């Protein structure tokens, strides 16, 4: 029997002190970075502002690093941006995910196409 047409699926996340960095927090931080606002990022992702801040605060507390810096509104408007630590974590997680994707793809070819 020839085993073809299969695709390997997986989920990857990082865990430290009970807080998880996976697709959800990755998407949130990426949106904050791109939009400059926790409020806009949370709306874009279909979550409440409170839920977004909750995810950020739990991770910050458990990991002992700041993730987001904010400035309250006013005439010039408020903003939010990632800390250097959060930016590095986000970029490193994306690289890890890309390399694992390639690895899993290669294994799938090896085991399910016979190449």
Predicted features, each with a name:
Residues 46-47:
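Central "turn" residue of the DNA-binding helix-turn-helix
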Residues 4-17:
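Short, Lys/Arg-enriched N-terminal segment that forms or immediately precedes the first helix
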């Amino acid at each position: 029997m020839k085993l073809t047409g299969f695709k390997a699926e997986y989920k990857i996340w990082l865990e430290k002190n009970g807080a998880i960095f996976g697709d959800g927090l990755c998407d949130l931080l990426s949106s904050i970075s791109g939009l400059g606002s926790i409020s806009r990022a949370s709306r874009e992702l279909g979550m409440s502002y409170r839920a977004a801040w909750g995810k950020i605060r739990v991770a910050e507390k458990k990991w002992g690093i700041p993730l987001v810096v904010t400035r309250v509104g006013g005439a010039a408007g408020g903003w939010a941006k990632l800390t250097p630590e959060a930016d590095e974590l986000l970029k490193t997680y994306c690289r890890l995910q890309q390399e694992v994707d390639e690895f899993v793809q290669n294994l799938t070819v090896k085991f399910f196409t016979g190449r």
